[in-house]
């Protein structure tokens, strides 16, 4: 696939210059649809991270640090237009790299462009305020960048998370060092190339591919970093926070989830059904905000089970290029993890299951989407994050029981309520432990304007919307005494 790329994937972007890893080493990038090698990527390490941080600081001390907010906004808007011009190419790259069906990959590319547009327009709209105080004082606050920000981006949604994290950081005038996941980093490199084309000053954005335990660990612990943004597993997120904590650096964590949808007897089932299924199988279930638990009130439980089982039976899994609703998992390692969870469900009833396309390569990382029914709320499959196309149906009797079950895991990223009862909608919006609660929908179309983040082991801090811009800035108070 290397001939289809307009950039060299074996390079890092450091200080506006494309260069190989200091060690000269590379890594193979594997296509999860068939197990073939796509290309080689740079295996950056601590030396490359150090060079990137130095370049980022130099950018802050130079042109980038002096650039007015409206000019930063123009750059991001220009970058968004370049992304739009490359939507189809970016989608094809992401489909090969992540195994994501083309339609889903294209939606991610459009979302990346939208982040650039939104943040480009917001760049000069964030400001401090004047504060009434004692006679003889003028007091005001300033919004300033943290400085050099580190961004560790996962493999499941590279473009979307680069947009919401790196895009927001650049908007506020930070200089970014991006470490993409070694399993899927091509669109990160493509974004960097487009940023250079857009005119982003040297060092404002630096990209160092590499292994998490090498480049990622070096970035988390680097004393020249002033803020870390991490999306990934709970275990790795804890390590990132510990490393950053030694330098007293703030961290935004977006981690795992076990997000429930609560379906009540009065729900509009025709409206709910597509969301119930799609929220669990999108990107083969490899979504932090995936809805892996479907809680259904007894009065409609059998109907929901039957209709979801029918929907699962209509699912076909195949290579990303076939653009089916479900593609492969990211790797055979992830396939082993998901298969292990499926084996733990041997004591459960399978209500519905998808099929593999006839031509699906044996070397691909495929699993059949699986719906389990009548699952106890304390079962492993109802409590642990699986990160695959697996959903569990859990019956409940009362609203109180539904809330108790929904809040019974360590996570709190997303929840959804399906009910026509307005009072119930408002009660549950408050009672559910989640960073986002959706009423009669799931995800709200993924709008870039909507703050996103979790509670509990789903992490802390907020990305997307204006909240992300506040998070990528720090407040300074100025009090002038003039008598």
Regions found by a protein language model. Name each.
Residues 1-41, 74-78, 126-152, 252, ...:
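Terminal low-complexity tails and localization/encapsulation signals of metabolic enzymes
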Residues 28, 42, 65, 98, ...:
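A structural signal for short, well-ordered beta-strand elements
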Residues 35, 72, 94, 116, ...:
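Residue-level signal for inorganic ion chemistry
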Residues 36-39, 225, 262, 316, ...:
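Conserved C-terminal structural/oligomerization subdomain of aldehyde/semialdehyde dehydrogenase
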Residues 36-126:
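Glycine-rich loop-to-alpha-helix module at the N-terminal edge of alpha/beta enzyme cores
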Residues 60, 64, 80-87, 91, ...:
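Structural signal for hydrophobic packing residues in well-ordered secondary-structure cores
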Residues 128-271, 323, 396:
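Rossmann-like NAD(P) dinucleotide-binding subdomain of oxidoreductase/dehydrogenase enzymes
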Residues 227, 235-376, 439:
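ALDH superfamily catalytic-core signature
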């Amino acid at each position: 696939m290397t001939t289809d790329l307009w950039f060299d994937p074996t390079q890092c972007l450091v200080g506006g210059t494309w260069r190989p890893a200091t060690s000269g080493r590379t890594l193979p990038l594997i296509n999860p649809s068939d197990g073939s090698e796509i290309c080689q990527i740079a295996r950056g390490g601590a030396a490359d991270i150090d060079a990137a941080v130095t370049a980022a600081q130099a950018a802050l001390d130079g042109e980038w640090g002096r650039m007015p907010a409206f000019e930063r906004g123009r750059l991001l808007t220009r970058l968004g237009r370049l992304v739009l011009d490359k939507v189809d190419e970016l989608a094809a790259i992401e489909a090969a790299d992540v195994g994501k069906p083309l339609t889903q990959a294209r939606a991610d590319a459009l979302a990346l462009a939208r982040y650039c547009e939104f943040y480009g327009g917001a760049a000069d709209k964030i400001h401090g305020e004047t504060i009434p105080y004692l006679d003889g004082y003028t007091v005001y606050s300033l919004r300033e960048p943290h400085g050099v920000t580190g961004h560790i981006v996962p493999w499941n949604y590279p473009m979307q998370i680069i947009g919401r994290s790196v895009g927001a950081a650049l908007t506020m005038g930070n200089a970014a060092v991006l470490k993409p996941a070694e399993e899927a980093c091509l669109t990160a490199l493509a974004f960097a190339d487009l940023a250079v084309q857009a005119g982003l000053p040297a060092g404002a954005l630096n990209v160092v591919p590499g292994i998490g335990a090498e480049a990622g660990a070096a970035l988390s612990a680097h004393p020249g970093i002033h803020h870390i943004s991490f999306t990934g597993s709970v275990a790795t997120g804890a390590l990132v926070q510990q490393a950053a904590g030694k330098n007293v650096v703030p961290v935004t964590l977006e981690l795992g989830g076990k997000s429930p949808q609560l379906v009540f007897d009065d729900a509009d089932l025709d409206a709910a059904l597509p969301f119930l299924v799609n929220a669990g199988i999108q990107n083969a279930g490899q979504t932090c905000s995936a809805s892996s638990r479907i809680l259904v009130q007894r009065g409609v439980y059998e109907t929901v089970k039957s209709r979801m089982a029918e929907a699962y039976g209509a699912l076909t899994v195949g290579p990303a290029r076939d653009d089916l609703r479900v593609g492969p998992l990211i790797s055979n390692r992830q396939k082993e993890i998901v298969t292990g969870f499926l084996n733990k469900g041997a004591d459960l009833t399978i209500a519905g299951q998808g099929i593999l396309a006839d031509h699906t390569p044996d070397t691909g990382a495929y699993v059949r989407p699986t719906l389990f029914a009548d699952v106890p709320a304390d079962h492993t499959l109802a409590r642990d994050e699986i990160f695959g196309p697996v959903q569990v149906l859990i019956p409940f009797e009362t609203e109180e029981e539904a809330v108790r079950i929904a809040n019974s895991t360590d996570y709190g990223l997303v929840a959804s309520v399906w009910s026509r009862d307005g009072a119930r909608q408002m009660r549950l919006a408050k009672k559910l432990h989640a960073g986002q609660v959706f009423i009669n929908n799931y995800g709200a179309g993924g709008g870039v304007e909507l703050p996103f983040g979790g509670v509990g082991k789903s992490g802390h801090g907020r990305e997307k919307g204006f909240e992300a811009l506040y998070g990528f800035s720090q407040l300074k108070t100025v009090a002038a005494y003039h008598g």
